[in-house]
Amino acid sequence: MPSDWFSRASAIPDAKGRVGHHAERIEAEAMQLEGYTQVDIIPWENASGGKGVECARPEGCTASFRFSQKPGWYDINVEYFDLTKGESTFRVYVSGQLVDEWVANDHLPTMQLGGDSSTRRRITGLALRPGDEICIEGIPDGEERAPLDYVELLARSR
């Protein structure tokens, strides 16, 4: 898959229309947001779509969407930013049921949203059906505002 960065930097036309198409990806800024606000990531290539979302409410925020693919078994990747200035808590729910929870407390080398703080949580083996609501709850800590980039839905072969 041609990269978004290379396409933009080279200015070579994308004759086959492949750049920027990530069918399995749902951008955080495109989800139904409750409390989260969109932020630009600089440089833009350090986040999918050049944007992310942050939560400024101490009680937490949610980002949700409806599953619209074929029913089956899936892995979910949650791409988020883990900064050195806090330990946000994340919870993932499928149709109201808690399926995963973690604290973003890796020791990454930066205090800014970007490539050095971008990390991923994989949740494996979830049975999903069309219409299921997938909801990510982020609870900020310190100066880390439970930042999210995107979610990927990966069908499993059994």
Task: Please identify what each model-predicted range represents.
Residues M1-R158:
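Extracytoplasmic
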